[in-house]
C-alpha cells in the first residue's frame, strides 16, 4: 500500500511539473535589458534602443491575445529598431487568409523609428513558408535573407544590419551577407541568425560587433541550478542570454537589451 502511495505521489508530481512547464512557466512576459558599449558607434546613436524578440511559435502558447500583449509592451519601450529572429508560427498551425490578416495587423502596429527586421527560422521552412513571408510583407517587416540593410540617421551616420538564412533548412551565405563589411569594417555591424551556434562560422569569416539569435529557448528543457538538459540542434554551444566571443557580443533571445551605448530589450 505504501509503495502504491509513493507511485501515485510521483505520478501526480510529474503531471504537475508538466502542467507548470507547459502552461504557467511559458505564460509570463519578462523583459531583459542589456546595455552594449562600443566606440564604433557614432555619437548620434547614443542610447539607441533595439527590441529583439524571437520564436513566437504562434498557435501553441502564443495566441492573438498574447501577441497583442507583446506588441503593446514593445511599443511602450518606444524602440528605434525592432528585430524578430525567426519561427513565427507553430508548425502544426493551419493557416488561412483570416489568420494571416490577424497576425499581420498586430505586427504592423509595432512602431520603430529606423525599421523592423526579421529572418527565417527552421520552423518557418517546415510549414506555412509563403504565409509567413506574406505576414512579414503586410506588417512592414523587412525580411533579410542573406541580405543586409544600412541604417542611416539624419546625421548620415550608418549602422550595418545583416540577416542570414536559416542554417538548418535554408541556404546560409555569409559572404554575400557580409560583403559590405569587407570595405566598410569601421561601420558598427549587427548580424541576425536564427541558430546561435552558427555565430562561430560567421566570426571566422567576418568580424562583426553584435549577433542576435533565437532558437534555443534559453535551454529547451532546463532545471534550476543544473541548467539545460536539452537544447535544439544549432544551440548546443550557445543557449543562454548573452555571450562575449573574441570581444564581440552574442545575444540570443528566448521566446519570449563616455562610449556610445545601445540598449537592447529581449522578450
Show where each model-derived region lies.
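N-terminal membrane-anchoring alpha-helices
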Residues: 1-44
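Binuclear metal-dependent hydrolase catalytic cores centered on His/Asp/Glu-rich metal-binding motifs
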Residues: 134, 138-141, 147-148, 154-193, ...
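Conserved beta-sheet core of the metallophosphoesterase superfamily
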Residues: 196-267
Amino acid at each position: 500500500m505504501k509503495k502504491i502511495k509513493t507511485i501515485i505521489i510521483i505520478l501526480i508530481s510529474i503531471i504537475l511539473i508538466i502542467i507548470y512547464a507547459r502552461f504557467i512557466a511559458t505564460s509570463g512576459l519578462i523583459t531583459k535589458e542589456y546595455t552594449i558599449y562600443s566606440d564604433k558607434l557614432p555619437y548620434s546613436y547614443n542610447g539607441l534602443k533595439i527590441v529583439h524578440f524571437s520564436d513566437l511559435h504562434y498557435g501553441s502558447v502564443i495566441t492573438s491575445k498574447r501577441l497583442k500583449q507583446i506588441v503593446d509592451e514593445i511599443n511602450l519601450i518606444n524602440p528605434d529598431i525592432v528585430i524578430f529572429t525567426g519561427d513565427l508560427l507553430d508548425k502544426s498551425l493551419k493557416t488561412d487568409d483570416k489568420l494571416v490578416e490577424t497576425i499581420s495587423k498586430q505586427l504592423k502596429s509595432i512602431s520603430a523609428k529606423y525599421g523592423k527586421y526579421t529572418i527565417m527560422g527552421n520552423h518557418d521552412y517546415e510549414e506555412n513558408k509563403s504565409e509567413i513571408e506574406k505576414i512579414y510583407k503586410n506588417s512592414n517587416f523587412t525580411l533579410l535573407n542573406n541580405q543586409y540593410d544600412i541604417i542611416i540617421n539624419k546625421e548620415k551616420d550608418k549602422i550595418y544590419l545583416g540577416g542570414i538564412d536559416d542554417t538548418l533548412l535554408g541556404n546560409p551565405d555569409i559572404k554575400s551577407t557580409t560583403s559590405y563589411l569587407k570595405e566598410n569594417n569601421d561601420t558598427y555591424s549587427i548580424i541576425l541568425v536564427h541558430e546561435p551556434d552558427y555565430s562561430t562560422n560567421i566570426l571566422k569569416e567576418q568580424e562583426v560587433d553584435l549577433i542576435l539569435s533565437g532558437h534555443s529557448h534559453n535551454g529547451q528543457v532546463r532545471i534550476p541550478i543544473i541548467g539545460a538538459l536539452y537544447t535544439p540542434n544549432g544551440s548546443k554551444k550557445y543557449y543562454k542570454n548573452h555571450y562575449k566571443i573574441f570581444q564581440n557580443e552574442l545575444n540570443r533571445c528566448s521566446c519570449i537589451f563616455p562610449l556610445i551605448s545601445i540598449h537592447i530589450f529581449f522578450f
